[in-house]
């Protein structure tokens, strides 16, 4: 069977609902990198892959609306982290899988997303999560929508870590080498400037 041709459709969630503390309170998804907002880079990558593009955002709703089929927001104003956005998106997803990406990772590429989808095809009942060396990257994951109840139970029990919330579901790894450049996380002004500078060399 041609696995690539058989890949089921997925909903895609771009996480842009954080407080932006490391960016001085700025909305990370709207910060420019290489002349475009970070969310615009992720939109260009993911738009061809889904008819259900969801953005989790808690401010600048009008700006984000142009990049999404759906917007979701946390059910409170406490900025409880990325699990809040995942929790809000899972019941709204139109497909059986939700592929999750952070807005501050613009170097993620299509081959990595394809590898995640192929792994999900092999393990349809379990979350798929990127692992860089020995470290899990829980915000680069695919979650079966059928697992929403487990994550909701973890949330109601006080869990706020996506990785720990998914542990009972036995995530399957997409294994990458340590320091894979595609996982560069531009979550501080210095990192953002450093990547821009390196790209000029």
From Swiss-Prot:
Enzyme Commission number(s) from the entry: 2.7.7.77
Molecular functions per Gene Ontology: GTP binding; metal ion binding; molybdenum cofactor guanylyltransferase activity
Needed cofactors: Mg(2+)
Keyword terms of this UniProt record: Cytoplasm, GTP-binding, Magnesium, Metal-binding, Molybdenum cofactor biosynthesis, Nucleotide-binding, Transferase
Location in the cell: Cytoplasm
InterPro entries according to UniProt: MobA-like_NTP_Trfase, Molybde_CF_guanTrfase, Nucleotide-diphossugar_trans
Binding annotation for GTP: 15-17, 28, 74, 104
Reactions catalysed: Mo-molybdopterin + GTP + H(+) = Mo-molybdopterin guanine dinucleotide + diphosphate
Gene Ontology BP terms: bis(molybdopterin guanine dinucleotide)molybdenum biosynthetic process
Gene3D superfamilies per UniProt: Spore Coat Polysaccharide Biosynthesis Protein SpsA, Chain A (3.90.550.10)
Residues annotated to bind Mg(2+): 104
GO cellular component term, pick one: cytoplasm
PANTHER family assigned to the protein according to its UniProt record, in alphabetical order: MOLYBDENUM COFACTOR GUANYLYLTRANSFERASE
Recorded domain comment: The N-terminal domain determines nucleotide recognition and specific binding, while the C-terminal domain determines the specific binding to the target protein.
Family indicated by similarity: Belongs to the MobA family.
Subunit (UniProt): Monomer.
Function of the molecule: Transfers a GMP moiety from GTP to Mo-molybdopterin (Mo-MPT) cofactor (Moco or molybdenum cofactor) to form Mo-molybdopterin guanine dinucleotide (Mo-MGD) cofactor.
Xref: NCBIfam families: molyb_mobA (TIGR02665)
Name of this chain's protein: Molybdenum cofactor guanylyltransferase
Organism: Pseudomonas syringae pv. tomato (strain ATCC BAA-871 / DC3000)
